[in-house]
C-alpha cells in the first residue's frame, strides 16, 4: 500500500513538473533547441545520465559482490574523519582520490553503460521523468531536482536567444527566479548561497568521489559543460570578439568524457564545478541564478554522497533531511564574499578548467604570472 501511494505521489508530482518545464520551454522562441540543438540534446541526456548514476550506485551497494569494496570504502572514510579532516579532504580532495575506486568492474560496467546514455538521444519527456523514475531518490529529492532543472532550462533558453539584449535577458532571468521560487516553494532550493561546510563537511562527504571516481568524473564533467557552454554563450554576446566558442566547450567536454570506461588524456573535474569559477559571466549578469544553480549542483553532489555511502541505514530519511537543508532559507547560509571565495578556493583547473581560456595545470597556491595563465574572465560584482 505504501509503495502504491509513493508511486501515485511521484507520478502526480512528475506530471505537474512536466507541465512547468514545458511552459518554460515554450515561452522562449529562438532558445537553446533552436540555436544550439546539440547542447539541448546533451542537457536531456544529462538528466537521464544523472538519474542513472544514482540508480547504478544504489544497485552496486546492494550487490553481494560489492561487500569488500563497501567495507574498504567505509574504513577509508572513517580514517579520514579520524584525521580531523571533517569527513572530507576539503578542496583539492581529488589529490587523494583512488582513480580505481573501490568497486572495480562493477563501477566500470556502470560507467560504460552511462557513457552510452550520455551519447544517446533522449526526448524531452524522458528527461523530465528521469528523476521521478529514479528508485534511488525520494519523492522530495526528485521533485527538487526536477523543478531545479526546469529553472535551469529557462535560464539557458533566455541566454541562448540572441534576439534580445543583455538588459532584456536580465529582466527575463528575474522573472524566471520569481517563477521558480513561487511555483512550488517546497521544491525550490534557497536563493541564498549555502556554506561550503554543508557540502564539504557533511557526515557522508567524499563517499561519491572516493567510492566512484569514474562516475563522479562523469557527473562533474556534465556540470562543467552546462556552466562552460553558458559562459561561452554569454561572453559572445557581451564581447563579440569571443563569439562562436560553444563548439570549443563541446570539444573540451568530450575530451573529459573520454572512452567508454572513462579513460582520457584530459582529466575530468575532481571538484564540483561552480558558477563563479567556470561561468563568471553568469554571476556578473545574473547573480541570483548563479546561486540557485550552484545550490542545485551542490545538492546533486551531496545526494550522490549519501547514495554512495556504504551500508547506510534509513537512507531515504537522510536524503530528505539533506534536501531540507538546501531548501531552507534559515540554515547554512553564507554571505556573498564567502560564497565567491569558496567557489574559487578549489581552483578553476580542478573544477574542469576555464570555458574558453587556457589553463594546463592547477593554479592553486601559485600566482597568475607564475602560471602564465591565460584565462578569459570578465566578472564584476552585481549591482
Feature locations, PLM:
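...the same signal can extend to comparable exposed beta-sheet modules
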Residues: 1-2, 27, 314-317, 337, ...
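Bacterial N-terminal signal peptides that target proteins for export
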Residues: 2-12
